[in-house]
């Protein structure tokens, strides 16, 4: 057997020249992205910095998707600074049916009051827009999907009646999942009550402007949301009575593209105008001036 050359030996010093250096894995922890700084846009799936979102009135700066906006934020956006006076702020719901499920109605109310800081799903009051006195109701979807129960219906009815008495226009910003099932028939009664108040408001020759936001559905859509003298909507808002899945299963038919969107309703004459959030205040002020001559 031929001898193995020394430079090929396992212990040859020459072999150290050709050795692959050992890679050391860093012991440093991965950088974690701080929570609460970014939001994924449901319109374009891009990550949007929360600061940019707030500065843009909760509208995606990339695709224009309108995120949900709280009632207090909308009031600040629409009403002249310092002019808003809330009405019936402490009115709260009771549990007339003693509703029990996974959680009782009272437990759900307590949870959402703590979560949102609201007493119920609507804030009502009076203020001015462009110096013109108005009555205002703004629904907040974050509170039990802004379902309409006895408190929501009563507060909206009261601000309509107060505005009729004071001869003021009424603006209602709508967003709702419908009637509040926890209150049974009492919630359905609010459809007729609010509609009746608006009929008396119209008989007095006073304007009502409805602003439909995403989503406006079911009992609210079938009552005061669609009774406006002028009906405005935010872009791409879902507006309809039953959901698309329920309609498909009931009719066994495919729905048209864009069905139940603000754009579809505008095309078919069911709303008057689609208004981006940034232009909503000036649009409403212009409409009020034209309708009242003020």
PLM region spans:
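N-terminal amphipathic/basic-hydrophobic helices that include classical n-h-c signal peptides
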Residues: 1-15
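Conserved, well-structured core domains of diverse proteins
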Residues: 15-30, 34
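An N-cap/entry alpha-helix motif that binds or orients negatively charged groups
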Residues: 24-28, 39-40, 67-124
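Residues immediately within or flanking Cys/His clusters that coordinate Zn2+
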Residues: 38, 57
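Short cysteine-rich clusters marking metal-coordination/redox-active sites
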Residues: 41-44, 60-63
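Conserved catalytic cores of soluble enzyme domains
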Residues: 174-292
């Amino acid at each position: 057997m031929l001898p193995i050359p020394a430079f090929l030996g396992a212990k040859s010093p020459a072999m150290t020249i050709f050795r692959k250096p050992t890679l050391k894995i860093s012991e440093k922890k991965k950088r974690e992205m701080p929570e609460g700084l970014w939001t994924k846009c449901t319109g374009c799936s891009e990550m949007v910095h929360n600061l940019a979102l707030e500065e843009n009135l909760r509208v995606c700066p990339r695709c224009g998707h309108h995120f949900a906006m709280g009632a207090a934020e909308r009031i600040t956006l629409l009403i002249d600074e310092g002019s808003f006076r809330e009405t019936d702020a402490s009115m709260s719901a009771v549990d007339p049916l003693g509703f029990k499920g996974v959680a009782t109605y009272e437990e759900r109310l307590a949870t959402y009051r703590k979560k949102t800081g609201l007493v119920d799903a609507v804030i009502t009051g009076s203020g001015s827009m462009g110096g013109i006195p108005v009555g205002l109701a703004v629904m907040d979807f974050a509170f039990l999907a802004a379902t309409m129960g006895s408190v929501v219906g009563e507060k909206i009815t009261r601000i309509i009646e107060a505005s009729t008495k004071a001869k003021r226009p009424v603006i209602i910003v709508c967003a709702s999942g419908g009637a509040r099932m926890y209150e049974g028939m009492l919630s359905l009664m609010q459809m007729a009550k609010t509609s009746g108040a608006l009929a008396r408001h119209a008989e007095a020759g006073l304007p009502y402007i409805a602003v439909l936001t995403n989503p406006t559905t079911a009992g609210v859509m079938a009552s005061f949301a669609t009774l406006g003298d002028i009906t405005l909507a935010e872009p791409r808002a879902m507006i309809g009575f039953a959901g698309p899945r329920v309609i498909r299963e009931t009719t066994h038919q495919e729905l048209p593209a864009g069905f139940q969107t603000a754009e579809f309703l505008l095309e078919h004459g069911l709303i008057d105008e689609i208004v981006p959030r940034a232009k909503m205040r000036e649009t409403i002020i212009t409409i009020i001036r034209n309708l009242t001559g003020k």
